[in-house]
UniProtKB/Swiss-Prot annotation:
The record marks D173, Q180, D184 as: Histone H3K4me3 and H3R8me2a binding. InterPro entries: SPIN/Ssty (IPR003671), SPIN/Ssty_sf (IPR042567). This is Spindlin-1. The 3 tudor-like domains (also named Spin/Ssty repeats) specifically recognize and bind methylated histones. H3K4me3 and H3R8me2a are recognized by tudor-like domains 2 and 1, respectively. The modification N6-acetyllysine is found at K44. One of its GO terms (cellular component) is nucleolus.
Amino acid sequence: MKTPFGKTPGQRSRADAGHAGVSANMMKKRTSHKKHRTSVGPSKPVSQPRRNIVGCRIQHGWREGNGPVTQWKGTVLDQVPVNPSLYLIKYDGFDCVYGLELNKDDRVSALEVLPDRVATSRISDAHLADTMIGKAVEHMFETEDGSKDEWRGMVLARAPVMNTWFYITYEKDPVLYMYQLLDDYKEGDLRIMPDSNDSPPAEREPGEVVDSLVGKQVEYAKEDGSKRTGMVIHQVEAKPSVYFIKFDDDFHIYVYDLVKTS
């Protein structure tokens, strides 16, 4: 039903897909349920909106370096509490969730809050939606030659604002994606894996405080020896060892199990 990340020119290689070091001028684009990467571009600072824009539809220009200004339209999903300048955005036609400081990033221009609001829809199967959260899955994607490619991943949570969408990440490409997974499940393109290997969550005493890494600065050593810095911005409720990380030099949101990798 969809194409995988690799099959088009300009995307990052399979070797890069498992690491955080990726060029910040690439975006993953979906056209007719196909994932691609395309370059985008930065511009001049914009005046700061005075009202809360979470849940709003927005559009803005984007210009990177000396490139042309391109126009982007999307939905603001969240404002990050540990960095209120940072917004999580789902752009139209793109599968990734992007993190941008909309009012500070010089690449953003002419930010406009649109009058149309996001339509709310009733979830078709609330029990299935709850069941798949936190589960390992196999997600089938249609390649450009019509064959199927299987991607293993984890369903992280229901997405905010767009209530029939789910956050998901993949072993081959640990960034944050959004899909309407109930549709994929019903079409046979999503399979929930048995969780016999998952240990039950540890029992907590009433009032027990569990340490969280949210708000912590992190440093990532790339294979070439260089380092990149970022911040832990979210802890996944269904899998508390899994966190979202926003690196300073990239607008993708990375998803890592920091217990396994520490």
